[in-house]
């Protein structure tokens, strides 16, 4: 068994939970009669989970019976 297979024998870890993006502090509202609305936070994208980059999807090995059907007597 190669080192890569040994590494990937275990299933990949679930992707990490994305931290909630922190909005920058909005500027003080200008002295205007209109209500001031701060700009919405830009959406932050989760980085791809590192495990999926390295690890191919783990395929379970089929049981023996599927590969070698028992000989009928």
Swiss-Prot record:
Q: Where are the sequence repeats?
A: 21-29, 30-38, 39-47
Superkingdom as given in the UniProt entry: Eukaryota
Instruction: List localization entries.
Output: Cytoplasm
Q: Give the signal peptide range.
A: none
Recite the UniProt keywords alphabetically: Cytoplasm, Keratinization, Repeat
Q: Where is this region: 3 X 9 AA approximate tandem repeats?
A: 21-47
Q: What induces it?
A: During squamous differentiation of epidermal keratinocytes.
Task: Cite the InterPro entries for this sequence.
Answer: SPRR2
Q: In its keyword annotation, does this UniProt entry include Zinc-finger?
A: no
User: Which GO CC terms are listed, alphabetically?
Assistant: cornified envelope; cytosol
Read off the Pfam families from this record. Answer: SPRR2
Q: Where is the composition biased (Low complexity)?
A: 1-11
- Residues covered by region (Disordered): 1-20
One of this protein's GO BP terms? epidermis development
Q: What is its main location?
A: cytoplasm
This molecule's function is given as:
Cross-linked envelope protein of keratinocytes. It is a keratinocyte protein that first appears in the cell cytosol, but ultimately becomes cross-linked to membrane proteins by transglutaminase. All that results in the formation of an insoluble envelope beneath the plasma membrane.
Q: Of which family is this protein a member?
A: Belongs to the cornifin (SPRR) family.
Protein name per Swiss-Prot or TrEMBL: Small proline-rich protein 2G
Recall the taxonomic lineage recorded for the source organism.
Answer: Eukaryota, Metazoa, Chordata, Craniata, Vertebrata
